[in-house]
């Protein structure tokens, strides 16, 4: 393209745009924003701490900094952290801690524990969250197609994480729904598989349809 926009760049996975933005922002700003978004922090879910995601460009050369801007270099992300981040984008920047256990009941059916989401801290400015929501919605509308998620209004992005050593890349898809009667966040990673859309996409499609049926009582 002779020119591009953030919307088109995200939709078409135009890596060079995000690499250039990372180099323009510089190490300090990139690190600061990554930490605000939860990189380097652990999230405790039902008493179980997650392994912290990592963004470290302290020793990065200029080209390495650009590489980090597209999720490569030494970047590491925990799928649960990414899913929490998706929930934060959907919620205007504030995350809600998910839970693994829905409920625990006695042999007589009396509940002794009921799981519930706990509001957490702000990971993004509300305007940033809204902008990302619009961009991810555009990505589904113009690239993946709404027919992929019938009955749902989805914001999503795929990813293909190269891991080197002659291994196949990790295929990713992450996102959330905009449906008030079916608020879902999802993150799929298929390790050593291939491209995100080809590998994680079909799983995300089936997962959302099944989850929506449960939430909506269908």
Where are these regions (language model features)?
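Beta-lactam-recognizing serine transpeptidase/beta-lactamase-like catalytic domain environment
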Residues: 1-190
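Residue-identity detector for glutamine
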Residues: 12, 72, 173, 199, ...
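Short, gly/Ser/Thr-rich active-site loops of penicillin-recognizing serine hydrolases
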Residues: 111-113, 117, 203-218
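Short alpha-helix boundary/capping segments
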Residues: 124, 192-200
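Intrinsically disordered, low-complexity acidic/polar segments
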Residues: 183, 195-197, 214
């Amino acid at each position: 393209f002779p020119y591009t926009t953030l919307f088109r760049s995200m939709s078409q996975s135009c890596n060079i745009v995000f690499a250039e933005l990372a180099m323009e922002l510089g190490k300090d700003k990139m690190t600061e924003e990554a930490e605000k978004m939860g990189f380097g922090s652990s999230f405790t879910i039902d008493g179980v701490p997650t392994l912290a995601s990592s963004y470290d460009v302290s020793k990065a050369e200029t080209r390495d900094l650009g590489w980090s801007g597209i999720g490569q270099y030494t970047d590491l992300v925990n799928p649960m952290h990414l899913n929490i981040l998706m929930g934060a984008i959907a919620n205007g920047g504030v995350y809600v801690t998910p839970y693994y256990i829905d409920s625990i009941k006695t042999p007589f059916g009396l509940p002794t524990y009921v799981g519930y989401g706990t509001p957490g801290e702000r990971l993004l400015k509300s305007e940033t969250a809204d902008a990302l929501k619009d961009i991810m919605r555009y990505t589904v509308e113009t690239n993946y197609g709404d027919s992929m998620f019938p009955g749902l209004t989805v914001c999503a992005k795929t990813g293909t994480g190269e891991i080197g050593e002659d291994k196949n890349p990790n295929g990713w898809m992450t996102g959330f729904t905009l449906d008030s009667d079916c608020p879902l966040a999802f993150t799929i990673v298929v390790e050593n598989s291939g491209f995100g859309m080809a590998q994680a996409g079909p799983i995300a499609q089936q997962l959302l349809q099944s989850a929506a049926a449960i939430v909506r009582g269908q």
